């Protein structure tokens, strides 16, 4: 009897091991497909990430919103490239929206991505004060819809999920620099919505054992940055001034301090986060800080103008060496609640991911100004 029981137990153990090996082999085969789904693919980060993933042999799917005008300028070179957009469908676009859970479920069940990069958001801080409900609907609840779509499609244990979080979570900073352990103190509807997004990712990771991660990205720029963001607004205006298409620029808080990096390097960090053995959250930053005023100095220096600053607050102006006012301050560009300083501590990303930024802020500014000058020369109305 004991021998029979021992044989039965041994057989049972062997079957369990076979199931485990079978499940492991199935998961390995699933991940080796290298299929990525990117929300927000038409944005700055989405376009750079698509380029990176295609270069690594991924099949890339992107979600775009239906609109009356095309908003695909940043990815046209990929969509129109026969190497990336061909019969094997290395690069595909799908209509969808973060406010429509049914379309998200349909896309995920059809595509069965191995990795999802959630970059879509209403990401303009000042606009979030004008559109607080919409910002919450897209940035907060939209993230929940996407996570729940993965769960509904029974892909919880297969898909790896990246959520684009933000340094705006720190808002009224509780310590300098800010790390993964720094308490959050959001100061805008955008930041509050992203805080929900952050914690719902953590919740799904803990509740369903999902490989879900947050990348707390500090400000990152490039020539593809949206025109309403302060860095791009500065470099576009400098380009127009150099071509005598504009006299000066109006800005808000010149003393605001930010940790700026290059978007191309930051999407590399996103990818590395999803290649780890265990899911975790990471601060992605340079660890260096510049003011908006200093960014202006660097940008104008690229066209041979050295700024001298006079006055304080809304009366402050920046004049070039000939005494011509190039920068003015306007109260309309101040936020109802300002975030005065943001400085990230990327030590964890450096140690765990092996990621470290190389492009400096002066190099970034140089690239952005040169790009905008070329753009304005080709089309003064751009």
From Swiss-Prot:
Pathway: Nucleotide-sugar biosynthesis; GDP-L-fucose biosynthesis via de novo pathway; GDP-L-fucose from GDP-alpha-D-mannose: step 1/2. Its cofactor is NADP(+). Its EC number is 4.2.1.47. Pfam families: GDP_Man_Dehyd (PF16363). NADP(+) binds at residues 40-45, 97-98, 119-123, 134, 194, 220, 225. Keywords: Lyase, NADP. One of its GO terms (biological process) is GDP-L-fucose biosynthetic process. It catalyses: GDP-alpha-D-mannose = GDP-4-dehydro-alpha-D-rhamnose + H2O. Optimum temperature is 16-23 degrees Celsius. InterPro entries: GDP_Man_deHydtase (IPR006368), NAD(P)-bd_dom (IPR016040), NAD(P)-bd_dom_sf (IPR036291). SUPFAM superfamilies: NAD(P)-binding Rossmann-fold domains. The active site is at residues 166, 168, 190. GO terms for molecular function: GDP-mannose 4,6-dehydratase activity. Belongs to the NAD(P)-dependent epimerase/dehydratase family. GDP-mannose 4,6-dehydratase subfamily. NCBIfam families: gmd. PANTHER family: GDP-MANNOSE 4,6 DEHYDRATASE (PTHR43715:SF1), GDP-MANNOSE 4,6-DEHYDRATASE (PTHR43715). Catalyzes the conversion of GDP-D-mannose to GDP-4-dehydro-6-deoxy-D-mannose. This is GDP-mannose 4,6 dehydratase 2.
